[in-house]
From Swiss-Prot:
GO function terms (MF aspect): rRNA binding; structural constituent of ribosome; tRNA binding
Species whose genome carries this gene: Clostridium beijerinckii (strain ATCC 51743 / NCIMB 8052)
GO terms for cellular component: small ribosomal subunit
Source domain of life: Bacteria
Gene of this entry: rpsG
Entry similarity comment: Belongs to the universal ribosomal protein uS7 family.
Listed name of the protein: Small ribosomal subunit protein uS7
InterPro entries in UniProt: Ribosomal_uS7, Ribosomal_uS7_bac/org-type, Ribosomal_uS7_CS, Ribosomal_uS7_dom, Ribosomal_uS7_dom_sf
GO terms (BP aspect): translation
Alphabetical keyword list: Ribonucleoprotein, Ribosomal protein, RNA-binding, rRNA-binding, tRNA-binding
Pfam families: Ribosomal_S7 (PF00177)
Length: 156
């Protein structure tokens, strides 16, 4: 907790190709060891593959995939009187986006394709069709929240 007040949130610049802040966040999440050029190459190659395979605009497929992966609810552990309850809570919009991107890339990294751009493209296409590991993660999270709906009154 900072003692000197609230720290202003830094705003990311939209990416140069698609002029989208979400794509910039996606690229920043792909990036490892500060190698942004490599991350951009992976992302834009994946978008090229998506456009080729689906015949649709890559950004449309990306946005549809993100909407299918972003969770609405999640559970948070809350300790009450010696018992720990999984309390379902709504997810804030910014966290929804962050979780969606994170789950998408975790699922992409676990895929079997040789190139990362192919993995990302495959996962985005699967997610836009409501299949794939990232969508399954979202469904599992929602099931957990649904199963623990009885503890919703312990909300934060």
């Amino acid at each position: 907790m900072p003692r000197k007040g609230h720290i202003a949130k830094r705003d990311v610049l939209p990416d140069p190709v698609y002029n989208s802040k979400v794509v910039t966040k996606f690229i920043n999440s792909i990036m490892e060891d500060g190698k942004k050029g490599v991350a951009q190459k992976i992302c834009y190659e994946a978008f090229g593959l998506i456009a080729k395979r689906s015949g649709k605009e890559a950004l449309e497929v990306f946005e549809e995939a993100m909407n299918n992966v972003m969770p609405l609810l999640e559970v948070k552990a809350r300790r009450i009187g010696g018992a720990t309850y999984q309390v379902p809570i709504e997810v804030r919009p910014e966290r929804r986006q962050t979780l969606g991107i994170r789950w998408m890339l975790i699922a992409a990294r676990k895929r079997g394709e040789k190139l990362m751009s192919e993995r990302v493209a495959g996962e985005l296409l699967d997610a836009s069709n409501n299949t794939g590991a990232a969508v399954k993660k979202r469904e599992d999270t929602h099931k957990m929240a649904e199963a623990n709906k009885a503890f919703a009154h312990y909300r934060y």
